[in-house]
Curated annotation (Swiss-Prot):
One of its GO terms (biological process) is protein modification process. This is Protein NrdI. PANTHER family: PROTEIN NRDI. The gene is nrdI. The lineage of its organism: Bacteria, Pseudomonadati, Pseudomonadota, Gammaproteobacteria, Enterobacterales. It holds the Pfam family Flavodoxin_NdrI. It comes from the Bacteria.
Amino acid sequence: MSALVYFSSSSENTHRFMQRLGLPATRIPLNERERIRVDEPYILVVPSYGGGGMAGAVPRQVIRFLNDEHNRARIRGVIASGNRNFGDAWGCAGDVIAQKCGVPWLYRFELMGTQRDIDHVRKGVNEFWRQQTRSA
């Protein structure tokens, strides 16, 4: 299986989801001066911001991470979190990233996710990487 990369704000909702998921993952730092470089294909897990609009939906740290061509070349899919209070824009960072990076939007969950979300994502991530391996 390949990597998961995620960003979590100081609310730690996405971080708690990733801990419960229990799969190897790398966190994009909160401090914008700290940078990471990913050397293997990965699925990005990202929260949505902005109160419901597309503008500002993707966290700055994630934009900076994806603006690094090395990192952008290795993204294979995106999973987004958000708040259902945002209506149609719920989890919209996933839509924005999928469209801009040309990768599938695999799943979305609310806030910290439910146990059902954890089970679905764990199974889905494993199946996604199996399919990627077969088609490579």
